């Protein structure tokens, strides 16, 4: 087993995850089996209870693990499926060590950071890295070198370096800020590497984030002061799309240097990623789409395009590449649609998407958008909460069930959405939802069946509430169809006769991959293409820049 450890310096948010995923993709292109581990130094057990305002989306793995969004990038770039064990947190490590101490497994020893915490970190890394027949394991250490939270993990990496001598490679991601006169400053990188050395670690390669490509003199200066060959100073300049980053790093000589340093030889030359980017570059048409959510604006909100709805954005991109038309997303604050007529906001869009979410805030605005899509024949895709609200909207405005709602929001005369039976006695919030992969059976001849091309599917879930079985008959009697089911659980709803009205209780975006888009997202993009042609007679033309 060979390990590639990716650390970060200067500041957080430099793109360590994309750098690590890109390295993995490049090594996959050479024929190697690659896996990935994300270390998160926070004390939380997992990301399940973290606010999207602070942390971005919670990504769900096949086994129900609720993890950092970087693991979604690993799955998409490497086309693999990870487990909750691929996400190591301070909370998990300390919980395990404390449980062992309580069971008497340390035989009366004083339990300390070194060796007990660091040994547990290394045990987890070795155990996970050897599953699935992988040959190379990427390890991204979250946070920034120098953070107190990261110290035990960096010490574990130092120990691993000597225990796995010759089979471990350190990549340090730093920043070269640019002054107003265009000078690239190297001092932050120098100080970051100095701090890393004080912990007993020396980077084998430095990937320098910068606005424009690193100048030769900047590379030479970093190489001189940080004790790495100039070939190991890689320009990580800004790219307009994350899927170009592997090719950019390849052009910088990153793959060649890592393979030489780790005594690796090309086993094959895969071109599928190059072909993907070429297909993406060839797209000249676009469609317009409204994403109506609650994490799209406000002083607390991070950039929604990157964080809270990341997997949805990527799934739309995958579908767009396949369909030959790129969705242009407009981020609509659901609360705005509680004050403004939907017609004024939504009339020029080719499709409307309501994503997953929790809580009552913004729900009326979302349902106003759903009603507009249903009544005006605009393609609609609802995900998780977006399906529940579509059912509530239909119950109120088509079935005449006044006050129909979800028990999540309080008392209601018509609880068309209710708590799952197995959730009724649950009191602890963390890791207690219906999480991970579950199957569904699709009815032949339905839109769902046409989209998937099969009657049996598996998708990822993250929810506590479901359609109340007591209301299924009245809903279907009035024209709604539940075309996908798992026993008594309704997984997919559609409205026959509508150009495209599809909503699902699961999260199809989390199984979408570049070159293998999620079927519902691909169908949605195709429906938007048709809507654009009906509405204007043509699709938009992308504005190309030199």
UniProtKB/Swiss-Prot annotation:
UniProt-annotated binding residues for Mg(2+): 70, 140
Binding site for CTP: 12, 147-149, 185-190, 221
Protein name, UniProt field: CTP synthase
Amidoligase domain as annotated region, ranges: 1-264
UniProt organism field: Methanothrix thermoacetophila (strain DSM 6194 / JCM 14653 / NBRC 101360 / PT) (Methanosaeta thermophila)
Residues at the catalytic site: 384 (nucleophile), 507, 509
HAMAP family found in the cross-reference section: PyrG
Glutamine amidotransferase type-1 domain boundaries: 298-534
Further remarks about this protein from its record: CTPSs have evolved a hybrid strategy for distinguishing between UTP and CTP. The overlapping regions of the product feedback inhibitory and substrate sites recognize a common feature in both compounds, the triphosphate moiety. To differentiate isosteric substrate and product pyrimidine rings, an additional pocket far from the expected kinase/ligase catalytic site, specifically recognizes the cytosine and ribose portions of the product inhibitor.
Enzyme class, spelled out: ligase
Gene transcribed to yield this protein: pyrG
EC number from the UniProt entry: 6.3.4.2
InterPro entries: Class_I_gatase-like, CTP_synthase, CTP_synthase_N, GATASE, GATase1_CTP_Synthase, P-loop_NTPase
Highest taxon, organism lineage: Archaea
SUPFAM superfamilies: Class I glutamine amidotransferase-like, P-loop containing nucleoside triphosphate hydrolases
Residues that, per the record, bind L-glutamine: 357, 385-388, 408, 464
Entry's Gene Ontology BP terms: 'de novo' CTP biosynthetic process; pyrimidine nucleobase biosynthetic process
Pathway membership, UniProt: Pyrimidine metabolism; CTP biosynthesis via de novo pathway; CTP from UDP: step 2/2
